[in-house]
């Protein structure tokens, strides 16, 4: 037999397994008071704290989304500014190339005109020197020719006017012959 059966058979009317009614009632009243206090005071505090935390989290999420949107907008603005800066740099580079080409063309044009001017001046100087050489040679050739002719002929050709005419006519004949030979070739 079990201990409970032995205890029940002993004749006492109190069952140790079944609690006393007054104890049960007192525990139920205490539990109801505790439940009332928890529902009335503790649960609202937890609800308030939970609501504050939820609001803080949702506010943080909203702030994070707002910051993300601002960062995205700033990134787009940065990309746009970067594209504008690149376009401006390309434009400046192209302008510099065009300006360099224009400067180079101007310098080539100036060099060509300066070269033409120098060539023209050189040709004028050469023509002047040639003319001076021709005049100088005519007088020298004339005097040498008259001296030589005077020695050959045996008489003096000291008359300057006559000797100059003879020399000029001789040189003119030489030039005419050289021009006709040059045209014939």
Swiss-Prot record:
TM region(s), chain numbering: 26-46
Pfam family, one: ATP-synt_B
Signal peptide: none
Keywords linked to the UniProt accession: ATP synthesis, Cell membrane, CF(0), Hydrogen ion transport, Ion transport, Membrane, Transmembrane, Transmembrane helix, Transport
Species of origin: Renibacterium salmoninarum (strain ATCC 33209 / DSM 20767 / JCM 11484 / NBRC 15589 / NCIMB 2235)
Cell membrane as UniProt keyword: yes
UniProt membrane topology term: Single-pass membrane protein
Protein task: F(1)F(0) ATP synthase produces ATP from ADP in the presence of a proton or sodium gradient. F-type ATPases consist of two structural domains, F(1) containing the extramembraneous catalytic core and F(0) containing the membrane proton channel, linked together by a central stalk and a peripheral stalk. During catalysis, ATP synthesis in the catalytic domain of F(1) is coupled via a rotary mechanism of the central stalk subunits to proton translocation.
Family indicated by similarity: Belongs to the ATPase B chain family.
Name of the protein this chain belongs to: ATP synthase subunit b
Subcellular location: Cell membrane
GO molecular function: proton-transporting ATP synthase activity, rotational mechanism; proton-transporting ATPase activity, rotational mechanism
PANTHER family for the chain: ATP SYNTHASE SUBUNIT B (PTHR33445:SF1), ATP SYNTHASE SUBUNIT B', CHLOROPLASTIC (PTHR33445)
Record's subunit section: F-type ATPases have 2 components, F(1) - the catalytic core - and F(0) - the membrane proton channel. F(1) has five subunits: alpha(3), beta(3), gamma(1), delta(1), epsilon(1). F(0) has three main subunits: a(1), b(2) and c(10-14). The alpha and beta chains form an alternating ring which encloses part of the gamma chain. F(1) is attached to F(0) by a central stalk formed by the gamma and epsilon chains, while a peripheral stalk is formed by the delta and b chains.
